[in-house]
Amino acid sequence: MQNKIDYKNIKKIGLVTRPNVSLDKEILKLQSILSIYKVELVLLKESSEILDLPKYGLDDLFKISDFVISLGGDGTLISLCRKACEYDKAVLGIHAGHLGFLTDFKVDEAENFFQAFFQGEFRIEKPYLLSIFLEDRQGKILEKLAFNDVVISKNNQASMAHIEVFRKEKKFNEYFGDGLIVATPAGSTAYNLSANGPIVYTLAQAFILTPVCSHSLTQRPIVLPKGFEIEIMAKDCMLCIDGQENYKMNDFKSIKVGLSDKNVALIHPKNRDYFQILKEKLHWGN
């Protein structure tokens, strides 16, 4: 994944916006700022129906852009991060949605950010994603990535989820309850946190198993290292990747999950402080 950005030779920056929301005013402001630095702003086709700016499909946008801006909330950024891994391109999150942990600033603050950026004053963090291998009944394997989490949950008909977890074909845990979350460190402050899972530093090489409303008081979250792959078996359950892609567990004979070798380069202001963000968002010390 992209380790550094040649900020002195940026020619094109792609932009993907939060879907189904008009952000034309914000797009024009970003275009105006970037034009000062002789940088062309190019859009995903669906980002605006009105603006007369170059527009591309998502794959072409990544191919021609030096990096890509996500203008929206955490959900917009998460879906973009999975795609960024395919093209080895960095992503910058600008907030225009529900306030989250991943987007650092609003469009009104973009002028100050880019002034610093084009002087080399920025940082890149590279959180790891999850790899999910879904093997269907015919032996075909589908590989997916998750930025935040994979959630196994009961379907509407089941009274509870029965989930078995194996390591090297040996069962090491069995869960009865509403479901199971497999979360990345970056995703530890999302659904995992709501289910009383631990907060894990974003750049840690680990992942988390957190039961959801377990029927046993002894079932607790567990943090596992990179290189530790688990196999999950559960009948009549659904598997959801990053809250965006859904699969029926019954369609697969094997589902394996572990921390991926792939990470995504996220561009941040140089003064970004992870623990200050936790303090502000979670109201620590108030």
UniProtKB/Swiss-Prot annotation:
Predominant cellular place of this UniProt entry's protein: cytoplasm
The compartments listed are: Cytoplasm
| This enzyme's EC code(s) | 2.7.1.23
Reactions catalysed, as given in the entry: NAD(+) + ATP = ADP + NADP(+) + H(+)
Q: One MF term in GO for this entry?
A: NAD binding
Q: What cofactor requirement does the entry state?
A: a divalent metal cation
Q: Could you state one GO biological process linked to this protein? A: NADP biosynthetic process
UniProt entry tagged with the keyword Nucleotide-binding: yes
Q: Which catalytic residues are annotated?
A: D74
**Keyword Kinase among UniProt keywords:** yes
> Keywords assigned by UniProt?
ATP-binding, Cytoplasm, Kinase, NAD, NADP, Nucleotide-binding, Transferase
Q: Which residues bind NAD(+)?
A: D74, G75, N148, D149, D178, A186, T189, A190, Y191, N192, L193, S194, Q244
GO cellular component entries: cytoplasm
Q: Which Gene3D superfamilies match?
A: Probable inorganic polyphosphate/atp-NAD kinase, domain 1 (3.40.50.10330), Probable inorganic polyphosphate/atp-NAD kinase, domain 2 (2.60.200.30)
PANTHER family, alphabetically? Answer: NAD KINASE
Q: What protein family does this chain belong to?
A: Belongs to the NAD kinase family.
| NCBIfam families, per database record | PRK14077.1
What is the role of the protein in this entry?
Answer: Involved in the regulation of the intracellular balance of NAD and NADP, and is a key enzyme in the biosynthesis of NADP. Catalyzes specifically the phosphorylation on 2'-hydroxyl of the adenosine moiety of NAD to yield NADP.
- From the Swiss-Prot or TrEMBL record, give the protein name: NAD kinase
